[in-house]
Design a protein with these regions (language model features):
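Intrinsically disordered, low-complexity acidic Ser/Thr-rich regulatory segments
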Residues: 1-65, 122-127
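Forkhead-associated
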Residues: 31, 35-113, 117
Length: 127
C-alpha cells in the first residue's frame, strides 16, 4: 500500500530544518495497492529521457519531490519473502523508522513500513 505519512514528513522537516513552505505536505494522497510480482520491483520516478520505468512508479500526483529516479528496490526471495535495498538514493530509505545503509538488503515482514522521499510510505501486506 502506497500513501503519504504525515508523521514521517513532520519528523524529516524538523531534522532537516525545513519549513512547510520548502516542501509542502500534499493536501490529498490516494492509497494505491500494488501487487508484488516477479523477482524484483524498482521503486522510483519514471524518466522517459533515461528510459526508466519503475514497477512502483511514484511520479503520479501528488509527486513527492524527495523520490529519486531509482530510489529503492524490492527483491523477492525463493521462500516468498521480500527484501528492500536502497541502491544510493539522494534522500535515503527507512524501514520502520530506521535508515537502511546503501546497498544493504533488509528483509521485510507483514506490516513493515518503508519511508522514502519527503512523505511517501509503502506498507507491506500479504494478499
Amino acid at each position: 500500500m502506497v500513501t503519504s505519512d504525515r508523521v514521517y514528513y513532520d519528523r524529516m522537516q524538523a531534522m532537516r530544518g525545513l519549513s512547510s513552505s520548502d516542501v509542502a505536505f500534499p493536501a490529498y494522497a490516494s492509497r494505491r495497492r500494488i501487487p508484488l510480482v516477479g523477482k524484483q520491483m524498482r521503486i522510483g520516478r519514471r524518466s522517459a529521457a533515461r528510459e526508466l520505468q519503475p514497477e512502483i512508479d511514484l511520479a503520479v500526483p501528488p509527486i513527492d519531490p524527495g523520490i529519486s529516479r531509482l530510489h529503492a528496490m524490492l527483491i523477492a526471495a525463493p521462500d516468498g519473502t521480500w527484501s528492500v535495498l536502497d541502491p544510493g538514493s539522494a534522500n535515503g530509505t527507512l524501514v520502520n523508522g530506521r535508515e537502511i545503509p546503501t546497498g544493504d538488503l533488509v528483509t521485510l515482514n507483514e506490516g513493515d513500513r518503508i519511508n522514502l522521499g519527503a512523505w511517501t510510505v509503502i506498507t507491506m501486506y500479504r494478499g
